[in-house]
Regions:
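Short beta-strand edge/turn micro-motifs at domain boundaries
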Residues: 1-26, 172
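Acidic/His-rich structured neighborhood in mature extracellular/periplasmic domains
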Residues: 7-18, 96-117
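N-terminal capping segments
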Residues: 22-109
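Active-site scaffold segments
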Residues: 76-84, 160-164, 174-175
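Short, solvent-exposed loop/turn and secondary-structure capping segments
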Residues: 94-98, 160-162, 186
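Active-site-proximal beta-strand/loop segments in catalytic clefts of secreted hydrolases
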Residues: 98, 151-154, 176-179
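...with weaker cross-activation on analogous glycine-rich loops/strands in unrelated enzymes
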Residues: 103-173
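Low-complexity, Gly/Ser/Thr/Pro-rich intrinsically disordered linker/tail segments
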Residues: 171-181, 186-202
């Protein structure tokens, strides 16, 4: 059940950049977006930014929510954090399959693969797109705050992150644990053609 996680920024340093000129032009020429947010989306953004461990606000910087166990020592905390965002924002209630209580969590709550499978199989989420970067980058512009991205390597989801904003060209930005990130590009710098992205609406 452990989800040993390699920082994708480091993983991409020695890999060829797959962003072609066509892709670069598409990204550069895309318009800024100003989505109308629901109360749940506003709460998801606020929670993610406060407890990501890399917050810009000095008061909240480098802090996780102490109400929850930090699962980094057990293989990774990314799915735990994504689950927290969904629960604390009021998006979903806990149940027998997706649950955290007194330092213990179900696989669907704390494991990246289990989390993705549960959200899809339960009907709580649906696919926007999945595939390599060149296959999904256009569809990524359909991501909204509170949606999440799963990162598949060698057939398994090894990481998840939550959409919490956009850059000046409308490129979705994510926030996550492992390694702690605040408002970074949704592709996380992964340029390995073996990586598949799962873009999921919740």
């Amino acid at each position: 059940t452990k989800e040993w996680y390699t920082d994708p920024f480091a993983d991409s340093l020695n890999l060829e950049n797959i962003k072609s000129e066509d892709i670069k032009n598409y990204i550069i020429n895309h318009e800024e977006v100003h989505p109308t947010l629901t109360k749940e989306q506003e709460k998801a953004i606020a929670y993610a930014h406060k407890y990501c461990g890399a917050a810009a606000d000095e008061e909240d910087g480098l802090m996780f929510n102490k109400k929850y166990k930090d699962f980094n020592g057990d293989g990774g905390d990314c799915a735990n954090f994504a689950s927290q965002i969904m629960y604390e924002s009021g998006r979903f209630k806990k149940n027998a399959l997706w649950n955290y209580e007194k330092g213990s969590a179900t696989k669907a709550w704390v494991n990246a693969q289990g989390f993705k499978n549960y959200i899809i199989n339960s009907g709580r989420g649906s696919y926007i797109a999945k595939g390599g970067y060149e296959e999904v980058y256009r569809e990524a512009y359909n991501l909204k705050p509170g949606d999440f991205v799963g990162y598949e390597k060698k057939g398994r989801i090894t990481h998840v992150s939550t959409v919490t904003g956009f850059d000046s060209k409308g490129y979705p930005l994510v926030t996550c644990h492992n390694t702690d990130r605040l408002l970074v590009p949704w592709d996380l710098g992964w340029s390995d053609k073996a990586i598949r992205f799962h873009l999921i609406r919740v």
